[in-house]
A protein has these predicted regions:
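Bacterial Sec-dependent N-terminal signal peptides
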Residues: 1-24, 104-106
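Sequence-level preference for short, compositionally simple segments enriched
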Residues: 21-329
């Protein structure tokens, strides 16, 4: 009897390990709203991922609308979130900066005081982990135009965003940590004001950058010691009907660094190109440049005097390897 009891205890001890090991492998986890996957929500799939994995795992998300506010925490690495179909696999939330914090939320003290949420809590998806890939999926903040509302908030390093739609209004994409790197390929990014902003290093290639209002595309806050901020290569700048006065960027912090090269610029881009955010001193420090752009909005004759047109030799040095400081990405 004693032996049976000991065996029973050993079995109970091993059960949690067996359950954990089911997802502690490189296999794909399937998420589906209709119950045909292993989980119905993306958050549930994230929760079973092992901390600091030394192998890759894919969270495959079937078509559907997933109303979730998500965090990929710093201890999760080597994860790909891949949608079944870019346009029909949608992660959506609707927080904005002026919403009052909920009691028991991220900052209950602020809620008691009646303080608004603020920009940096409004994300639909926050990525704190590194070596993360987002692919074939839509990430949306569908809040009303009542304040800043972040769709994708990036804090990790070495983040790849490929063939995604990033939808929002003000402050759609936030690259939140200086020097950390993110690359966007074949994406559609839309917004109204400062809809790509922050201090991080980011490379955008073959992306459509869609302006929804007469305002500003970028608001980089690159620190002084960081050579590169935002680089847009072979991108297409478009606008909704009636939008015809858009700046390429304004400096959120004095040393903002932004480059557009080999891009197609629509007629909505203002002739002067860049704005100093109402501070003449920013003209001495902001690092705004262009190279080999084309289209109705690419003419350089009327560009502000404090922006630069790169030479062919200078532009040849602007590669993703040099911007990110490593050969493989």
């Amino acid at each position: 009897m004693k032996k049976l009891f000991i065996s029973f205890l050993m079995m109970l001890t091993l059960l949690p390990l067996a359950a954990a090991n089911k997802y502690d492998n490189p296999d794909t986890i399937v998420v589906s709203r209709d119950g045909t996957g292993e989980f119905r929500t993306i958050d549930e799939a994230i929760e079973v991922c092992r901390a600091f994995m030394d192998y890759s795992k894919v969270i495959y998300v079937k078509e559907g609308v997933y109303k979730e506010k998500l965090i990929l925490p710093s201890w999760l690495t080597n994860i790909t979130i891949c949608g079944e179909d870019r346009d029909n696999t949608i992660i959506t939330w609707d927080d904005h900066a002026n919403i009052k914090m909920p009691v028991g939320g991220l900052d209950s003290e602020a809620a008691v005081k009646g303080k608004p949420m603020g920009t940096f809590r409004t994300y639909t998806l926050k990525v704190q982990g590194s070596y993360i890939t987002l692919k074939n999926i839509t990430i949306e903040n569908n809040a009303a135009k009542l304040g800043q509302a972040v769709s994708l908030h990036l804090e990790g390093d070495h983040i790849l965003v490929q063939n995604c739609r990033l939808l929002g209004n003000q402050d759609t994409v936030y690259t939140g940590i200086a020097n950390n790197r993110s690359a966007f390929y074949d994406c559609y990014i839309e917004g109204t004001t400062d809809f790509i902003f922050g201090p991080g290093r980011a490379w955008f290639e073959n992306c459509e950058i869609r302006s929804k209002a007469n305002s500003y595309i970028t608001a980089a806050s690159s620190p002084a010691g960081q050579e590169y901020g935002y680089v847009f290569n072979k991108c297409k700048l478009t606008a909704e009907p009636g939008v015809d006065k858009v700046y390429l960027g304004r400096p959120w912090r004095p040393y903002a660094a932004t480059l557009f090269m080999n891009c197609e610029m629509g007629s909505h881009i203002r002739p002067e190109g860049w704005h100093n955010w109402g501070k003449q001193s920013n003209e001495q420090t902001a690092r705004y440049s262009e190279y080999n752009n084309h289209g109705a909005g690419a003419a350089t004759k009327a560009r502000v005097a404090w922006s630069r047109q790169l030479t062919k030799k200078e532009a040849a040095k602007v590669t993703i390897e040099n911007v990110f400081g490593e050969e493989a990405w």
